[in-house]
């Protein structure tokens, strides 16, 4: 177990005799337990059993019952203390047998927390625990022993005792310092406990624990651990936690939107998708329902976005904001929020053909506690375009991913490319940048190592998050390339991080992004972003891509479509020639209500229904308990759960996957689920 080889018993006869004695003890104990016998002899027998086998979890219930039977409200305090001492003694002896016995630690907590009784030596309990934990490191040299100083049970019990004794957090922080500095840099629980204490003290603004000084002091402290024992992980986990606090604590709440501030949007009816090339270079939004999405994307999950916190300064009233999330309750936190704005030429606000819309945000609080203290406004312009009648044959033409693209006009770059806005000013922003820069310079001086390269890459990404000038991406990408060559065991993780950095590099500057942008003239010059053939394994930076209507991610190494749910304008998506293994990996596409064209051909999508390992933990597209009125073949179940929400889908390509997705049966299934579908696998469906 836990990678340890089972050793052969050197004294099997002695072991057999002990087992026989243990069975005899258990038999006598169970008899006493069932008959509710709580005599002195019975209690002593249970104590002997627990000391012999602390893992006999059921046996820990017996002393609790015996304890209750021996006491009442009028019990003499000296008797109470005597019984408590006896119970604590049994627990201590049991812990000497097995320091990681859940039952022993829980029983000790139960004894000390008895209501109506006060254990006068409670103050000594913390000192005893101090001595126990500090002496435990002596067993570290014995490879056959677990290291008790890293015992999670003991540290959990410590927090319980600290609460009872009202010990200060400053004293406990000093205790972790003593444990780490005097005993071992590798005590993970001490580092974890330290992070909890530091967070609390900084949040309370305790004396000497302002963010700037505290983070700098803690960074200097953890350097001793990570540079002394570089191969040990405990200190590195704490360092990464500190890095996260340096970047995120009180960071400005940033957001992007569509439409973005200052943009001009042309609204038109459904047939504009099939109109011939337009002369305009402005964003055209075509709608079959007479509405368009107003999208807010925050860099932190927020809740409570509503008509009271986001107001529309025009005749458009009573917008309903919905989180782009699988959770159905109204209190959900989400980074992406969407409202549907109705437009109708008969309405007064649209009779002018051009309407300015002002959106004001205020009173929003993120899940990290970041307050939008000052209101923020942005304004965009809507133009109503007269719908042009298009012949039926043109409406049903197939969308090609190889022809019909024009280069992006550099002179027509819209505000959409630079729409990320800081909502809050952070008074500590400069010292945070300085702290990250100091760490970068420090890690540049270290000899080459896997952990050193990984931390340097994370530090450079952290600085890019703060300054957003794109100067570090080339180095970051090279670091992850080096790591993939050095450490094949974690190749997929490095590849994912490389993909994130690459997409951020592409979207960091208008010059680099414009090289991937095109206009698709066969659909009224909608905006197409082509990120194909980049070996991407993960999607990122979608907050900068909200304006994209056509996205080509073909010939990459993607395993899922996670992240695309924020791109509410997407009407055409190409995910062909990737590594997607099931329709459940496409679950995020259910939120793309404008999607008309989907290409998932030449992946590894199979018909086997995946096992839903999250069924009892969170909502899942594989949990089908709410489905009624429709019988779906089991082999198409996960396909149904995705396709049923793509009601505007007109073109689907799923060639080159499992054979069950070919043939008349699947064609019939798709036409039932997606009634507007016209093209399947490159062939036009007959009426």
Curated annotation (Swiss-Prot):
Subunit structure: Heterotrimer composed of the alpha subunit RGTA, the beta subunit RGTB and REP; within this trimer, RGTA and RGTB form the catalytic component, while REP mediates peptide substrate binding.
Mechanisms controlling activity: The enzymatic reaction requires the aid of the Rab escort protein REP.
Its job: Catalyzes the transfer of a geranylgeranyl moiety from geranylgeranyl diphosphate to both cysteines of Rab proteins with the C-terminal sequence -CCXX, CXXX, -XCCX and -XCXC, such as RABA1A, RABA2A, RABF2A and RABG2. Does not seem to be a functional Rab-GGT alpha subunit in vitro.
Keywords linked to the UniProt accession: Leucine-rich repeat, Prenyltransferase, Repeat, Transferase
Enzyme Commission designation: 2.5.1.60
Coiled coil regions, renumbered to chain: none
PFTA repeats: 38-72, 83-117, 132-167, 168-203, 214-248
Pfam families hit by this protein: LRR_1, PPTA
Domain of life of the organism encoding this protein: Eukaryota
Higher taxonomy: Eukaryota, Viridiplantae, Streptophyta, Embryophyta, Tracheophyta
GO MF annotation list: Rab geranylgeranyltransferase activity
Record's protein name: Geranylgeranyl transferase type-2 subunit alpha 2
Annotated organism of origin: Arabidopsis thaliana
Family annotation (SUPFAM superfamilies): L domain-like, Protein prenylyltransferase
Family label: Belongs to the protein prenyltransferase subunit alpha family.
Keyword Translocase annotated: no
LRR repeats: 523-545, 546-567, 568-591, 592-616, 646-668
